[in-house]
Design a protein with these regions (language model features):
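Acidic, low-complexity cytosolic segments
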Residues: 1-32, 41-147
Length: 147
């Protein structure tokens, strides 16, 4: 079994701030089970307490993939930017929302969750802490800074 997630080294917000906010979101919104903030390339920035490290990383990778596919569809069909992506499963709902520049907020809900309320609370969280949710893009072709 994996140990609980501790993303302290990856955060752009002060230690614990994103985790606390994600835990609060999961506790307040009926049906929510998990929440994760991720960079657009799928790195975990913050995660709710009930997620193991392995599960947080898996959810972030899945959310990044769906969000990227939706952005590609938006570009191809000239439909504009992606605000939200939703995947409805037999007993769960995955919602991914753009959150700041280069980041996403992904939540996993039971199928009993109120999608409208979940989306509303996600938007409130993103608005409240948008500057903390921004994740700088990784530059692949740039050499590491010397210090």
């Amino acid at each position: 079994m994996s140990e609980p997630w501790s993303p302290r080294s990856l955060k752009t917000a002060p230690p614990g701030e994103l985790d606390w906010l994600l835990d609060d979101l999961v506790a307040r919104v009926r049906g929510l089970r998990h929440a994760v903030v991720l960079s657009n390339d799928g790195l975990v920035v913050g995660a709710s307490d009930a997620l193991t490290r392995e599960d947080a990383e898996h959810l972030a990778a899945v959310a990044s993939g769906f969000h990227s596919l939706a952005k590609g569809a938006g570009r191809h069909f000239r439909a504009g930017g992606v605000r939200q992506t939703m995947v409805e499963m037999d007993v769960g709902i995955l919602i991914i929302a753009a959150a700041g520049d280069g980041a996403c907020l992904a939540v996993l809900s039971s199928s009993a969750g109120d999608v409208g309320m979940i989306a509303y609370e996600m938007a409130r969280l993103v608005t409240r802490v948008g500057e903390h949710l921004a994740a700088p893009p990784r530059l692949r072709d740039q050499p590491p800074a010397s210090g």
